């Protein structure tokens, strides 16, 4: 048991809290050194510490032996609590905007006895946290302390404009605790700080401790001369002074949370500027810079050392970390302008939504002693996102610092600061905040090492991605009619996205008002309600600050989950639109659907789906072609992407522009997802793409494998093992994924949908110049052309009678065809060719050969891609020869299109896709009958009338060619190779796995 203090006469505190008391005592002493010249109230109380007063020695360690039982010993032992009592009151009350700093109580002879009342740490903490409204506090108020209202007698009344004198040196202002310490030294004991800035205990300053970096090492104690230096008074602008207002203030301190702020600056005038011309005058003008980029330039006032500008500038800033840099120059015609001085304005010291008059002293870093005059400004800082902040994100930010860098009281202080900020944001009274603080101190985790362990675990949990409530996938498609920001009537636009602390930036599209981005970004949702995504469009300017084009927002709570939404957003404060695709996908905590809950397993739902796509409902919603259900079961033998030999795999399922994700299975090479995805089929010729990625918190996800499955090749209800392929789908990679897919569709709707343009996929891999790809496309085109060349050689050989029997047969056939030719014979010949190849296939005489040439070319291309990736990492500056590259890429793509066209015609007659070949047979039969029954002149007449009147009947109809649309559904030889299924390893067979389990 711990010895009792004689003067206190209280029950003994528990032994478990003794170590915490000792640490709290030590931290209170450290807080004294950090809070010199702090808070309001009267200075020089009987026990008040100044820079001249040394800190008392720490109390002796608590043990099991006897301790001195004198009243003086007890009083000195717990004097730290009494001296910091109202400091604690000020700290916790500072979270309420209508509370003021209370003055310290005078110590009375009986004060030690009152401080020692209570038997536990909880009792003592309650006494220090609850504001005293009677007794000593009232007495101190009556004796000349802080009067009602919270202001000391010498404090000036606060004004609405908060006029302040801010003089700056060219060096950036200090940040964090060091800035507060320096401000305390300059202001001295008589200065009065705003209550939001009180920082008596390390780690308990409500907002700075939450949002600022860790404090630097403690500076050496200052001499009495140094501590008295600020009291002698300062010349105007001789040193940097932090903005402070006396008394109570309802203005909010700007948060360091990343966000959009509007800075309205009125450049009023200059006084006593430096003369730079021979006549003893100057032609001054002012530049504003943020982040090294110019954001404003004033007009030139000729021959004046006291210029009056009265110019206004509106600046949008992303964050408040960068100060505003003000530079003054003297304009010289034909020569370099002369420098007249500069100053910094720290944006973090400005109060929100409150006009502030600022006086800046100009300095030259090369000649710091020269008097260069002053600049007068009026500044208003306004948050663009409003006053409400995401409390969840602020709490997450408070745990970013490692527990190795935080002492115990800093963890407690930051935790208190977050909760204080929460109650302040909600506008609740002070009592619930104090109640929370008491409850937290009673928590057993506040004891010894257990608290640090718990804080470390909580920090890790907040950083873990399995706390996501979902994933927001945003596809930035294009911009339309954006505002021209450059002198040439164009812009170089890019877009920024922000959701909480997550930010993304798109690529820059040079010199266009209708950019095509086609980029995709993923955000993590930490709230059930979703949140709001802030979107801003900017114009890139070299050497200057980027111009603001416009902004818009997406409220995720208004969007339904598991669906892809196409949004056309009007830019506010600007011109133009942004076109986005937004998909909300649930995470593991709110699953898409488990294997036990899916549509096709329920017999009633299955019958309803079959009825919806029955042949009787042909003309009901022609765009709804079918229903697709994908069961993502598991994967085995995935590639290890982390240094630990494991991966954090998740699966992405894509059908055209619909994109859904599974949850992440951590530290596993054989993950089991057991999720069911459902899609509405708009085109039966679409390809289902299933990609496995490794999640990486610090950078983009790593590719593990991919498989592409045409919907028409799917066998319903069969669990199948698909070997994962590389990014180009040209060769296998490590791992197998098990899928079970069901497709239900209406054949008539699918056939009609085949004859209209296919849906464009917005996210496609950007083409790049590749020597091997260019060679491959040239060879493909050459093979198609050689078919026609060989046919011409064959006909010419018949004319030359190289083989008399063959030439004679060709001559007789020519006479017969020309004599009896009718137009319907053209589709009839094609029909006979299709029928002939079909009978060859079903009879087992398949003349289709595996295209090994194309496969070899794809393998060579894959090797070259790997080399290009390595070269691109070494040569990040490859921006040369862009014009030649664009031309070569265009030629490369044209060769690809021509070669693909010829290959699609060949594959149509080869029955590569039986559905399309049967559709071609039906179409050719109909076309043959029409040509047989109707004269050609009437067919041509109907065709011409249709073409001439199409725009009159449907002004916005898309001009298309049905034959080309049909051929676009037929895969080329490259796609045939990509869609081929690889034979899995027999060890991965699900049936063998079950047999082994049974055995």
Curated annotation (Swiss-Prot):
Biased composition (Basic and acidic residues): 175-185, 228-238
Residues bound to Ca(2+) 4: 486, 539, 541, 547
TM stretches of this protein: 811-831, 914-934
One Pfam family linked to the record: C2
Highest taxon, organism lineage: Eukaryota
Membrane disposition: Multi-pass membrane protein
Binding residues annotated for Ca(2+) 1, in chain numbering: 277, 283, 330, 332
Binding, Ca(2+) 6: 642, 694, 696, 702
One Gene Ontology molecular-function label: calcium ion binding
GO cellular component term, pick one: membrane
Subcellular location(s) of the protein: Cytoplasmic vesicle, Secretory vesicle, Synaptic vesicle membrane; Recycling endosome; Endoplasmic reticulum membrane
Biased composition range(s): Gly residues: 34-44
Bias type Low complexity, positions: 1-19, 65-79, 131-141, 149-169
Cofactor note (record): Binds Ca(2+) via the C2 domains in absence of phospholipids.
Domain C2: 242-360, 452-569, 603-724
Residues noted as binding Ca(2+) 5 in the record, renumbered to the chain: 642, 648, 694, 696
Binding site for Ca(2+) 3: 486, 492, 539, 541
Keyword Repeat: yes
Regions of compositional bias (Polar residues) in chain numbering: 92-101
Swiss-Prot/TrEMBL GO biological process terms: calcium-mediated signaling; negative regulation of cell migration; negative regulation of endocytosis; negative regulation of response to oxidative stress; regulation of neuronal synaptic plasticity; regulation of neurotransmitter secretion
Keywords: Calcium, Cytoplasmic vesicle, Endoplasmic reticulum, Endosome, Membrane, Metal-binding, Repeat, Synapse, Transmembrane, Transmembrane helix
Protein name: Multiple C2 and transmembrane domain-containing protein 1
Highest classification ranks of the organism: Eukaryota, Metazoa, Chordata, Craniata, Vertebrata
Gene it is expressed from: MCTP1
């Amino acid at each position: 048991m711990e010895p009792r203090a004689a003067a206190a006469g209280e029950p003994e505190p528990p032994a478990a809290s003794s170590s915490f008391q000792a640490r709290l005592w030590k931290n209170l002493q450290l807080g004294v050194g950090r809070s010199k010249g702090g808070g309001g109230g009267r200075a020089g109380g009987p026990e008040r510490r100044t820079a001249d007063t040394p800190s008392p020695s720490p109390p002796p360690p608590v043990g099991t032996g006897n301790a001195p039982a004198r009243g003086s010993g007890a009083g000195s032992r717990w004097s730290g609590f009494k001296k910091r009592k109202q400091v604690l009151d000020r700290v916790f009350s500072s979270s309420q905007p209508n509370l003021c700093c209370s003055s310290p109580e005078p110590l009375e002879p009986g004060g030690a006895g009152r401080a020692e009342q209570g038997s536990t740490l909880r009792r003592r903490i309650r006494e220090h946290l609850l504001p005293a409204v009677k007794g000593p506090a009232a007495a101190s108020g009556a004796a000349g302390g802080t009067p009602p209202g919270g202001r000391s007698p010498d404090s000036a009344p606060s004004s609405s404009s908060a006029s302040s004198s801010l003089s700056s040196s060219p060096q950036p202002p200090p940040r964090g605790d060091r800035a507060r310490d320096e401000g305390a030294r300059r202001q001295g004991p008589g200065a009065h700080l705003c209550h939001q800035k009180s920082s008596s205990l390390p780690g308990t300053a409500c907002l700075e401790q939450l949002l600022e970096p860790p404090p630097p090492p403690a500076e050496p104690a200052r001499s009495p001369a140094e501590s008295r230096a600020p009291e002698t008074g300062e010349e105007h602008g001789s040193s940097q002074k932090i903005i402070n207002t006396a008394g109570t203030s309802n203005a909010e301190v700007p948060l360091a949370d990343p966000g959009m702020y509007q800075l309205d600056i009125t450049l009023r005038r200059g006084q006593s500027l430096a003369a730079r011309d021979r006549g003893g005058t100057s032609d001054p003008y002012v530049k504003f810079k943020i982040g090294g980029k110019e954001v404003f330039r004033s007009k030139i006032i000729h021959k004046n050392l006291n210029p009056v500008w009265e110019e206004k500038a509106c600046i949008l800033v992303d964050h408040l970390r960068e100060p505003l840099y003000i530079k003054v120059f003297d304009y010289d015609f034909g020569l370099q302008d002369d420098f007249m001085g500069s100053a910094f304005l720290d944006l973090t010291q400005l109060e929100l939504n409150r006009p502030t008059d600022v006086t800046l002293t100009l300095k030259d870093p090369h000649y710091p002693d020269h008097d260069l005059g002053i600049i007068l400004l009026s500044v208003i800082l306004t948050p663009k996102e409003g006053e409400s902040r995401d409390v969840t994100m602020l709490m997450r930010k408070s745990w970013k610092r490692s527990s190795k860098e935080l002492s115990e009281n800093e963890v407690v202080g930051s935790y208190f600061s977050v909760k204080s900020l929460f109650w302040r944001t909600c506008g609740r009274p002070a009592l619930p905040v104090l109640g929370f603080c008491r409850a937290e101190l009673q928590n057993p985790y506040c004891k010894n090492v257990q608290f640090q362990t718990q804080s470390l675990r909580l920090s890790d949990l907040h950083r873990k991605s399995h706390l996501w409530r979902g994933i927001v996938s945003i596809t930035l498609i294009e911009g339309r009619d954006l505002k021209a920001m450059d002198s040439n009537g164009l812009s170089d636009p890019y877009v920024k996205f922000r959701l909480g602390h997550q930010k993304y930036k798109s690529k820059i599209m040079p010199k266009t008002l209708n950019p095509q981005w086609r980029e995709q970004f993923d955000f993590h949702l930490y709230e059930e309600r979703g949140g709001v995504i802030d979107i801003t469009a900017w114009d890139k300017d070299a050497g200057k600050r980027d111009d603001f084009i416009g902004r818009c927002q997406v409220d995720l709570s208004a969007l339904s989950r598991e669906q892809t939404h196409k949004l056309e957003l009007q830019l506010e404060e600007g011109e133009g639109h942004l076109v986005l695709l937004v998909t909300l996908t649930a995470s593991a905590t709110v699953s898409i659907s488990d294997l036990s809950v899916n549509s096709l397993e329920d017999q009633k739902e299955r019958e309803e789906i079959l009825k919806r796509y029955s042949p009787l409902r042909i003309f009901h919603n022609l765009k709804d072609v079918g229903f697709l259900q994908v069961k993502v079961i598991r994967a085995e033998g995935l590639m290890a992407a982390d240094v630990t030999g494991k991966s954090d795999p998740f699966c992405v399922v894509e059908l055209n522009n619909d994109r859904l994700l599974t949850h992440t299975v951590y530290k596993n090479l054989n993950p089991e997802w057991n999720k069911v995805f459902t899609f509405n089929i708009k085109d039966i010729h679409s390809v289902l793409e299933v990609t496995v990625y490794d999640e990486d918190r610090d950078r983009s996800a790593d590719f593990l494998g991919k498989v592409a499955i045409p919907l028409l090749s799917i066998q319903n209800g069969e669990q199948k093992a698909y070997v994962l392929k590389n990014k180009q789908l040209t060769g296998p990679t490590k791992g197998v994924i098990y899928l079970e897919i069901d497709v239900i569709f209406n054949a008539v709707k699918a056939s009609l949908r085949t004859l209209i343009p296919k849906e464009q996929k917005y996210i496609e891999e950007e083409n790049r110049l590749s020597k091997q790809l260019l060679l491959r496309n040239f060879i493909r085109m050459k093979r198609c052309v050689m078919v026609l060349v060989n046919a011409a050689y064959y006909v010419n050989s018949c004319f030359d009678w190289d083989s008399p029997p063959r030439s004679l047969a060709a001559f007789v056939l020519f006479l017969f065809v020309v004599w009896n030719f009718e137009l319907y014979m053209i589709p009839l010949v094609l029909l006979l060719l299709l029928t002939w190849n079909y009978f060859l296939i079903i009879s087992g005489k398949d003349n289709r050969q595996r295209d090994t040439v194309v496969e070899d070319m794809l393998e060579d291309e894959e090797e070259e891609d790997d080399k290009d990736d390595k070269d691109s990492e070494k040569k990040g500056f490859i921006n040369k020869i862009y014009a030649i590259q664009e031309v070569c890429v265009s030629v490369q793509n044209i060769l690809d299109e021509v070669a693909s066209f010829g290959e699609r015609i060949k594959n149509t007659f080869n029955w590569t896709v039986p559905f399309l070949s049967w559709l071609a047979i039906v179409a050719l039969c109909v076309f043959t009958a029409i040509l047989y029954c109707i004269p050609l002149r009437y067919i041509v007449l109907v065709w011409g009338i249709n073409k001439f009147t199409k725009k009159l009947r449907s002004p916005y109809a898309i001009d298309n060619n049905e034959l080309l649309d049909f051929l676009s559904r037929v895969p080329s030889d490259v796609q045939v190779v990509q869609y081929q299924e690889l034979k899995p390893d027999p060890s991965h067979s699900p049936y063998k796995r079950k047999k082994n389990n049974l055995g």
